[in-house]
């Protein structure tokens, strides 16, 4: 006779496997509980714990740095970098909020709506920074820059793909957007801005906004990867060689577009403390990481020595995400209105 304990384990495992086999992330679920994908709610908590608004930061010294301290060549790099960041931030705020329309499950909605709110905060922050740096007029014309326009086109293509009624094609667009836009596209610009503070001790307020933004974008990208892995588990036949080649092709195209942005940013000269070649390898590494997160092989060769010189960035951005979800900063102030210095915050 089989012991009752073993039988209980057997039937419990059978039940769980049956439930897993019948999961469908695209199938509407009316009831809130029980959760089918409870692990996803950690991303909602992560954004809540990272909550910030731009009025928390003091930019008085940044204005002085931008107008007086830095060279004209550096000012041009900063200006273009900020314009490139802001252009993306004003275009992506609807993506996450629409996720629930195609995956009508409570966990997806909770995370998606939380992410959408964070994108609005990002947009507000960079709109304010453009005003502070006197770049509002230039922002009106930034879409005329060929490199920026090229990125707008492939971003629009990804977003347009989310309107597809075909679940497989929709999955492709979610993958491309979350892993190549959210997880890569802005990060070379984040690296540039934060390096000014690290190497020259300037632009402290802006650097803190960029760091806060990049931590949240990292969470967005990781959530996207987890969604793709769930879909892959539920629909393995979608991820055939043709589908993977399509992703690889899009990845190469996205890399070329990002290189075009860098060429524009550095057209008047490079930074001595952050060579353009180093940033190229930084971007390649992030693309590789995105592919590996969904079980695909990396496609770019990277120079590990060049990556070592910027590993401080990954430590800053990802060092706390697995543990305390951004309990790095103080909360003993009025978040809605009080402007504080970097020493107060960190």
What are these regions (language model features)?
Residues 1-7:
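Intrinsically disordered, low-complexity segments enriched in serine/proline and basic residues
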Residues 21-346:
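Non-heme di-metal
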